[in-house]
């Protein structure tokens, strides 16, 4: 992350996609900026400064997950979102919490590999074109030229070579312009190693994955001739050439460093592994998961197939609705590891109006763009937008509060007929008015039983 990404810049970027929730945006912006600040310190102090993990508290659909997702994109950091309910205490059937870090490393390796391939794109593209040109214009064989043209002057051989090079360049330009995209050729490609299914005991996913890698590596690099269009052949050849040009060991080393220094783990549904205040006694599946999370959040060393990972400087963002349980129902040790608490507010009508209109790729803009592909110009009156927001808010209040996700349900119902008939519509300019919204959604909202199942 560069120095340019100040907390204000980060918040401004988040506001392009997320409406409201300024406290949460500020908290994550400061946490991200502290990453950069830490990297400016001397080595001794840097090791002592650990990230201040965040606990987001708020109902579903108010932006908790979206904030974390956008933050990871801004930071260009390895990011993984997991649900706390998917894990069980070590020794019980199910995934153990250390698999979070292993999955995070896999994400980082994939990310760094893509970055490395991007750097060699130009060279890989050139090599891929050469492979295609070798098929289209096979180079003259050396042995043939020695036998067949023993008395041929050196000048003639040179001019033939020059002519061949000119022809190749003409065809190279045709390939680059896409003029030969649909022409079929036969090209030699690497055969993907067969994946061997390994059945392992529950919770031993890492071991089974390593065994699969071992069996795959035992299979020799086989090649086979495959018939395909030049367009597809270029893409395949470019991927193969890029894979040869990148240094896998360097990728792994950089991925491990990225995880240790900049990794972000988003723990969703943390409230679902809380012990309810009213319950007495320990709950193995719930409290055990929290106790297993403690070493990860506090800082420990996890073994992965790429190497050892220290979790001391990984940022953990936990979130939960806390409808039934309270944050104080988390075990005290875990509460202490989540020092920054941010409460996200429920969405009001005004928030729904802004969500429909303001984000860069708002719901309305998405539907307008989708209909545009059918030649339909869709527009919404201001009063109609407010009416949609009011309906979404009302259904949330009366049925179940699912936050901004309710807007998707309402919009799908509202535009169902238009979406279905779009290809055959004669009138291509459609303006959504308040009357249209009332006609399509009015009865459903009034009838609570219907809205419960349809909206």
Curated annotation (Swiss-Prot):
GO terms for cellular component: HslUV protease complex. Its main location: cytoplasm. The keyword ATP-binding applies. The keyword ATP-binding applies. It comes from the Bacteria. One of its GO terms (molecular function) is proteasome-activating activity. It is found in: Cytoplasm. Keywords: ATP-binding, Chaperone, Cytoplasm, Nucleotide-binding. GO terms for biological process: protein unfolding; proteolysis involved in protein catabolic process. Belongs to the ClpX chaperone family. HslU subfamily. A double ring-shaped homohexamer of HslV is capped on each side by a ring-shaped HslU homohexamer. The assembly of the HslU/HslV complex is dependent on binding of ATP. This is ATP-dependent protease ATPase subunit HslU. It comes from Francisella tularensis subsp. novicida (strain U112).
């Amino acid at each position: 992350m560069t120095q340019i990404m100040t907390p204000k810049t980060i918040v401004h970027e988040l506001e392009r996609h997320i409406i409201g929730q300024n406290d949460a945006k500020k908290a994550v912006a400061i946490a991200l900026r502290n990453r950069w600040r830490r990297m400016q310190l001397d080595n001794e102090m840097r090791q002592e400064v650990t990230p201040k993990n965040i606990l987001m508290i708020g109902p579903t659909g108010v932006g908790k997950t979206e904030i974390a997702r956008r933050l990871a994109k801004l930071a260009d950091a390895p990011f993984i979102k997991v649900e706390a309910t998917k894990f069980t205490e070590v020794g019980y059937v199910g995934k153990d919490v250390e698999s979070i870090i292993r999955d995070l490393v896999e994400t980082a390796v994939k990310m760094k590999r893509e970055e490395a391939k991007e750097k060699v794109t130009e060279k890989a593209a050139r090599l891929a074109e050469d492979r295609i040109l070798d098929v289209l214009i096979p180079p003259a064989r050396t042995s043939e030229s020695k036998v067949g043209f023993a008395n041929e002057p050196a000048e003639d051989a040179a001019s033939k070579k020059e002519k061949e090079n000119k022809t190749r360049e003409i065809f190279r330009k045709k390939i680059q312009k896409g003029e030969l995209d649909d022409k079929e050729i036969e090209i030699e490609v690497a055969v993907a190693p067969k994946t061997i299914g390994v059945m392992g005991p529950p919770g031993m996913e890492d071991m089974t994955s390593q065994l699969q890698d071992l069996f795959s590596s035992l299979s020799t690099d086989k090649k086979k001739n495959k018939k395909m269009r030049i367009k597809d052949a270029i893409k395949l050849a470019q991927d193969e050439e890029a894979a040869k040009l990148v240094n896998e060991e360097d990728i792994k080393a950089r991925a491990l460093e990225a995880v240790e220094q900049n990794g972000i783990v988003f723990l969703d549904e943390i409230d679902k592994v809380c012990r309810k205040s009213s319950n007495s006694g320990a709950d193995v599946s719930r409290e055990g998961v929290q106790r297993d999370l403690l070493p990860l959040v506090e800082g420990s060393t996890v073994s992965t197939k790429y190497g050892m990972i220290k979790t001391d400087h990984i940022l953990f963002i936990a979130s939960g609705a806390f409808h039934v349980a309270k944050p104080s129902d988390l075990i005290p040790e875990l509460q202490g590891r989540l020092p920054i608490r941010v409460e996200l507010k429920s969405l009001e009508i005004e928030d729904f109006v802004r969500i429909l209109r303001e984000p860069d790729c708002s719901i309305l803009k998405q539907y307008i763009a989708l209909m545009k592909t059918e030649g339909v110009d869709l527009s919404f009156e201001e009063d109609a937008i407010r009416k949609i927001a009011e309906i979404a808010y009302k259904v949330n209040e009366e049925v179940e509060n699912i936050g901004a996700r309710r807007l998707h349900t309402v919009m799908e119902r509202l535009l169902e007929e238009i979406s279905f008939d779009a290809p055959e519509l004669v009138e291509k300019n459609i303006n959504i008015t308040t009357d249209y919204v009332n006609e399509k959604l009015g009865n459903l909202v009034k009838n609570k039983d219907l809205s419960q199942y349809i909206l």
